[in-house]
Amino acid sequence: MADVGATGAEIRATRIEKAKTLQAQGMSPYAYRWERTHTAALLQDKYAHLAAGEAVGDRVSVAGRIMARRIFGKLAFFTLQDDSGTIQLYLDKQTISQTMGEAAFADLKHLTDVGDILGAVGTLKRTEKGELSVVVESYTMLTKSLLPLPDKWHGLTDVEKRYRQRYVDLIVNPQVRDTFRKRALITAAIRRYLNEQGFIEIETPVLQVEAGGAEARPFITYHNTLEMQLYLRIATELHLKRLIVGGFEKVYELGRIFRNEGISTKHNPEFTSIEVYQAYADYNDMMTLTEAIITTGAMEVLGTLKITYQGETIDLTPPWRRVTMHDAVLAATGIDFRQLGDLTAAKIAAQKVGVKDLDTCDTIGRVLNEVFEQIVEPTLIQPTFVLDYPVEISPLAKPHRSQPGLVERFELFIVGREHANSFSELTDPLDQRQRLEEQARRKAAGDLAAHSVDEDFLTALEHGMPPTGGLGIGIDRLVMLLTDSPSIRDVIAFPLLRPESAGGQV
């Protein structure tokens, strides 16, 4: 039965029968291993000099997935794909029959399908049409696929299926594979750069007694043996700071973070970030470090600092623009929050420029931040450091050395998204206690993103933490930027989705 016109169930049943036939003939449809001498890319490079019609007697062994089959009587052409690329298999009945017996070519025609994984041994030639090919002397079924590949996968309107069956997406879409290769190169380059600068990566707990280091709702779990509630970490900050207290002067961790919050093209509940802490530095030093980390990633995978994201040209060449939050809001809206006397006046001014959802804003600083996020943030296309945030939304940052009510904090925005967050870290344990106790009061009042006081962290601070600059960069968003990917789901191999039985996509 041909795949064309057949249902998925019919195709599967037919392929199971083919697997049984192979088994009956003494050929396992699921091999244990294969001795491969060359990848497709290595062959394409090594034999690029062959002219059309030229052949060499070098014997090679290849393996990969059949992506296309064309059979013309006593001659067949298969496209074989491995991790490096594709190579054509040139299969003629006479050559294969001499090596494997008369039935081998018929088995090739009738028992193989697109999607199967095949091993082949042969010599090299370039066909008259210019296609480098392995002239197959013998072949072995390595894995019989039971389900068909889609004829056209990339470009389907049902993008959810691409995320849900990522393995199929990876098989048929080279661009997706390239995205994840670039992701690996970016993270490796960042680690290499930091290591060269004298930083050390230390792993901190994922399961934590207290959630802290960010204003975010945590995932909650339970340890049966200890009979205690635990949280999946929402940040690595507080443990990395403990390491600074302990005497490490340059530490970082690149790892997974978990936040029980919304899902969008910019947010996934499980994501990757890197946090970096440097003793005797402040947020000015962290701006320089941020530029270095991001440009390192860009040069690693793109070789240039002038990039394109979703049609927008972005120039990552340092130094990047720096503007205070107050000045950014003033320029965009005409509102000078430094001149507003009370919360009511701040809310009225914000509402006049179209800002919504101000009910939970209980200070002028929170209103300022809401205006910034709704009005200014989407306009920050080129790399921009926004500096000096209200103290009430930055409980772990050091007070600004010259601006009361503000802290030494910046966030980096590119293409209207936050890409990094940094502080001159708060090292005063008494001030830190007051801020964490305020958070605890907010939690008691029902704020799910606020947290209890982490007494052990405060104990660490009371032992003395040197002046420290801290930095966090979202790896997923950075990979989105450097691979021109519109959604965070495009750069996470297996993004969280609601099970199909529960009603499909979130």
UniProtKB/Swiss-Prot annotation:
Similarity remark: Belongs to the class-II aminoacyl-tRNA synthetase family.
PROSITE patterns linked to this entry: AA_TRNA_LIGASE_II
Reported cofactor(s): Mg(2+)
Protein known as: Lysine--tRNA ligase
Cofactor descriptive note: Binds 3 Mg(2+) ions per subunit.
First-level EC class: ligase
Binding site for Mg(2+) 2: E418
Location relative to the cell: Cytoplasm
Organism placement in taxonomy: Bacteria, Bacillati, Cyanobacteriota, Cyanophyceae, Acaryochloridales
Organism for this UniProt entry: Thermosynechococcus vestitus (strain NIES-2133 / IAM M-273 / BP-1)
Keywords, sorted A to Z: Aminoacyl-tRNA synthetase, ATP-binding, Cytoplasm, Ligase, Magnesium, Metal-binding, Nucleotide-binding, Protein biosynthesis
InterPro entries linked to this entry: Aa-tRNA-synt_II (IPR004364), aa-tRNA-synth_II (IPR006195), aa-tRNA-synth_II/BPL/LPL (IPR045864), Lys-tRNA-ligase_II (IPR002313), Lys-tRNA-ligase_II_bac/euk (IPR034762), Lys-tRNA-ligase_II_N (IPR044136), Lys-tRNA-synth_II_C (IPR018149), NA-bd_OB-fold (IPR012340)
Primary gene name: lysS
NCBIfam families found in the cross-reference section: lysS_bact, PRK00484.1
